[in-house]
Amino acid sequence: MPRRVLQGVVISSKADKTVTVKVERKFKHPIYKKFVKVSKKYAAHDSENKYQEGDKVSIIESRPISKTKTWIVVNGE
């Protein structure tokens, strides 16, 4: 099964080797037929402490690194 890749924005980089990434997605509500925007936060591993708040990054699914981290930052802008 291929690993999932998500794009989002770094909203916190205060922890050592960890960033919090906010991923937004849009979908059409099945009953009301309105587009709804939903966001979710992921803790991602940043081994070089390279990314700061506001950076756009891609994260990839991986094995569990800690209790909450199962994503790794692969590249950013």
UniProtKB/Swiss-Prot annotation:
One of its GO terms (biological process) is translation. SUPFAM superfamilies: Nucleic acid-binding proteins. Transmembrane segments: none annotated. Keywords: Ribonucleoprotein, Ribosomal protein, RNA-binding, rRNA-binding. Coiled coil: none annotated. Part of the 30S ribosomal subunit. PANTHER family: 40S RIBOSOMAL PROTEIN S11 FAMILY MEMBER, SMALL RIBOSOMAL SUBUNIT PROTEIN US17M. Belongs to the universal ribosomal protein uS17 family. This is Small ribosomal subunit protein uS17. It comes from Rickettsia akari (strain Hartford). The gene is rpsQ.
